[in-house]
Amino acid sequence: MTVVKGEGSISFAEASVEKYKNDAAFTNPLTIVGDGVVTYESSDPTVATVNATSGEVTIVGVGTTTITATITDTDEYAYEKKTASYELSVDPAINLAALSGDYIAQNGDVLTGTLAGNYKISIAAGASVELKDITINGVDDEAYKWAGLTCLYDANITITGANSVKGFYEDYPGIQAGPVGTTLTISGTGSLTATGGDDAAGIGSGYDGASCGDITICGGTVTASSAGYGAGIGSGYNASSGAITISGGTVYASSSMDGAGIGSGHKASCGDITISGGMVTASSGDWGAGIGSGFSGSSCGNITITGGTVNASSSSYGAGIGSGFSGSSCGAITISGGTVNANSGQYGAGIGSGSDSTFGSITITAGITQVQATRNYATAAWPIGKGFSDNDSGAVSIAGVTVTSKDWDGTGLTDLNFATSSTGSNNLTWTLTPKVP
């Protein structure tokens, strides 16, 4: 009688595996036909080690390694192919889904994945960090009093892929910029959606005495909103932020209630606002300006637009660009370039003051591509200048001409064309464009 051994085989479930450097230990299942003894080894233990008996892999570093299983013949089975292997690639990114506690991102870190727990994610002082397809969804629970992402000091954020960050409690922003005297810079080619709580900014500061430093956006597509009384980008309720600078990318900023789209929230303040490029759309839901100050004694510094395409609107008593409602203010408004479309839904000016508020001054030069400003509803409000019940605002100068009336017809202009239009209700639009030589 001739006894023939069985034909054995081994194979891994996956021919290749991709992991992140902070992922937990794992096993790629091995299918075995027969009763041979298997041992495992890693070609590069500086990337990952493997338990020789169980095949469980522990990630050590980043790079690529080959995990190999070797089986021996037995009395019952013979193995023509005695090895099986797979390639393991370890990405240097930090996988938020694998975190088991709070994490402070260090310089050079790439964050990715969806945060699975209610953990505080911060950026170390001075660190440059990439956000790559992250999702941080705050739960709006007072047990977790922090922002979706907190900058501990100066921070540089590069966005790639699609990213979404939401604060964990109503008083906290989606992204908390660093303290006063620091700068948060956002750039890249991806998208970022940042959502603050009821009393906080989307990007900036939180509620009641909170503050933050400067905010600079120079790339990517950034959508920032407050669920309530904060600015989309800037300060929260009764809070403050530093200067806001936008030089590139596409920016959408909005507040659903009394804050500005870009600027200050309710009873709040922010520094200078500068836009020199990109596509910017900013809106306030109720009594704040589209770009500028919020409601009830809020303030912002100078507003300067030198380029880009800017669309700013207030749905109620604030200006499109300028100050919000009720004792609010803004500094000097200067528009020297770009295409600007600003309008107020009710008692505010298109560019200037909100109802019962002020602006420092308005200067529009001949270097613009186009400026269009609309007042709606209240005939006392100007398209460019004073809102309803203005509190003694400063001078209005358009291409060197001092404007003293809401009924101005462009008299005195030499470098700009002036057009006026209305749909027959109380709205009024002024459009300024360069004269062609």
Indicate residue ranges for each PLM-predicted region.
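A composition-driven surface/loop motif
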Residues: D91-P437
